[in-house]
């Protein structure tokens, strides 16, 4: 049985981690695809 505290930490960290990875990937994609188009 998973402890409530551990479950709460996981449920709290997972969305933040996914959001951080998504933002980082989006920034890299936008920087890698948009700048050559402007040049």
UniProtKB/Swiss-Prot annotation:
Main location: membrane
Residue ranges of the TM segments: 5-25
Name of one Pfam family that matches: PetG
Topological relation to the membrane, as annotated: Single-pass membrane protein
GO molecular function, one term: electron transporter, transferring electrons within cytochrome b6/f complex of photosystem II activity
Keyword terms: Electron transport, Membrane, Photosynthesis, Thylakoid, Transmembrane, Transmembrane helix, Transport
Compartment(s) of residence: Cellular thylakoid membrane
Superkingdom, taxonomy of origin: Bacteria
UniProt xrefs under InterPro entries: Cyt_6/f_cplx_su5, Cyt_6/f_cplx_su5_sf
Family: Belongs to the PetG family.
Function: Component of the cytochrome b6-f complex, which mediates electron transfer between photosystem II (PSII) and photosystem I (PSI), cyclic electron flow around PSI, and state transitions. PetG is required for either the stability or assembly of the cytochrome b6-f complex.
Subunit composition and interactions: The 4 large subunits of the cytochrome b6-f complex are cytochrome b6, subunit IV (17 kDa polypeptide, PetD), cytochrome f and the Rieske protein, while the 4 small subunits are PetG, PetL, PetM and PetN. The complex functions as a dimer.
Name recorded for this polypeptide: Cytochrome b6-f complex subunit 5
